[in-house]
Amino acid sequence: IKRDVENAKAAPSGASAGAATQPDGLILPQVLDDRVYAPDSYELVPLDGMRKTVAKRLTTSFMQVPHFPLNIDLELDHLLASRAAINAAAREGVKVSVNDMLIKAAAMALMDEPDCNASYTDKGIAYHKHANVSVAVAIEGGLITPVVFSAETKGLAEISEEMKDLATRARERKLKPQEYSGGTFSISNLGMFGIKSFASIINPPE
């Protein structure tokens, strides 16, 4: 205890040793405590710019934005039957996914419920005129959310083709900044891993 007190006295005021205080008030560790983890007991992999940005933005969001997850069970028999019929009649090369249908459904719902398609600001509530749906895409070393802009105006085939293009270029790290910013609502899917439900973190300023 005496050693801890002496170390605390020697540490800079306002932050503990081995930690950095960010402009937004977050205290992030710069190094692991050698008294807990020996330096040769782990391998340190530096973060790239994207991971640093994602970590900071989502940590801030989780701390500052009220989160209240809601869950409901849905019967998707009709949706799956409709998807099969749509794909059977679609032109060659078009294959609509469940995700594509969820993008369209979310966009239509957002236009019907403007309060869900809004962003809070200090000057007031910004009600967005279009449903710009972000879709989480896993890429090497992180996650990115390309946007289907004005999704309420697009058909399923157009959404499907656009989403395939965005996801491909996202994995190749060829997206332009304007293609993964400006969303008003996000969709993240973990169903392929057997996940039935999860509480996601709001992607600000959505």
Predicted regions and their residues:
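C-terminal catalytic/motor cores of large multi-domain enzyme assemblies
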Residues: I1-E206
